[in-house]
């Protein structure tokens, strides 16, 4: 991994099954860190025991965030599903606040509800976070940026039809953009459709640098310092 210029990786949980996989990777590789949480698609499967396990794992030295948490209404159209997702989103944000960890948020077709909940928690005091694979408008981005949050940018920024995301990248401060993979999904051009990995990050960094009118070396250096 070091040969690709990648020095550190955060492996992000999305399900209970991913908890121990992340722990094993953290223990095996010194450059792998973890984020622990449950994706909104599995919110209806969560119990108090699940939340207790998230809290327990958050105490590990190399567990650096709570995530991937949030709201996803793309497949979940019913109001009762939305209510369950919001309840578990809040429960995991509570853990992030109490354990003094940043969060990593997934939001799909749920822009307003996600923004309202995040704004509520940020006003109450949080330790920052990332809006993972940001896909909403520049106006929504502005609200998150004002709260001091980061926008996660992945392979989609290299796609020709990603006009909205490219406008957001041009608008957002470089200091609030974070490189992401969403592995194994969202491989950037020229590897679109193939399995993604952190080795594809240079393509994402290059696309962002071109949109910003700077060199890729300058961008990645600043991001690493941040």
Residue ranges and their predicted role:
Residues 8-18, 45-48, 55-147, 167-168, ...:
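Divalent metal-binding pocket/active-site signature
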Residues 203:
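Active-site hotspot residues in diverse enzymes, especially metal/ion-binding acidic/histidine motifs
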Residues 148-162:
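His/Asp/Glu-enriched short active-site or ligand-binding loop at hydrolase and phosphoryl-transfer sites
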Residues 220-226:
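Conserved small/polar residues in nucleotide/adenosyl-binding loops
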Residues 1, 22, 34, 68, ...:
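Residue-level signal for inorganic ion chemistry
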Residues 1-41, 64-67, 102, 150:
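Divalent metal-dependent hydrolysis catalytic cores, especially in the metallo-beta-lactamase
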Residues 65, 177-179:
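Residue-level marker for buried hydrophobic side chains located in beta-strands
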Residues 37-40, 135, 155-159, 183-184:
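Short, acidic/turn-prone active-site loops that include or flank metal/cofactor-
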């Amino acid at each position: 991994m070091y040969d690709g210029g990648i020095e550190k990786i955060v492996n992000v949980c999305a399900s209970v099954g991913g908890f121990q996989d992340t722990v094993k990777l953290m223990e095996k590789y010194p450059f792998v860190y973890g984020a622990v949480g449950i994706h909104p698609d599995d919110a209806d499967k969560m119990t108090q025991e699940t939340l207790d396990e998230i809290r327990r794992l958050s105490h590990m030295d190399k567990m650096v965030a709570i995530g991937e948490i949030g709201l996803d209404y793309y497949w979940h159209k019913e109001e009762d599903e939305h209510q369950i997702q919001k309840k578990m989103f809040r429960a995991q944000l509570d853990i992030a606040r109490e354990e003094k960890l940043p969060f990593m948020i997934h939001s799909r077709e749920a822009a307003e509800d996600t923004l309202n909940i995040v704004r509520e928690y940020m006003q109450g005091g949080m330790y920052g976070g990332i809006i993972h694979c940001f896909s909403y408008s520049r106006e929504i981005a502005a609200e998150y940026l004002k709260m001091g949050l980061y926008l996660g940018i992945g392979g989609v920024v290299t796609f020709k039809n990603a006009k909205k995301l490219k406008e957001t990248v041009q608008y957002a401060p470089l200091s609030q953009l974070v490189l992401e993979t969403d592995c194994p999904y969202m491989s950037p051009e020229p590897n679109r459709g193939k399995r993604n990995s952190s080795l594809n990050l240079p393509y994402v960094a290059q696309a962002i640098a071109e949109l910003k009118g700077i060199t890729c070396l300058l961008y990645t250096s600043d991001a690493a310092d941040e």
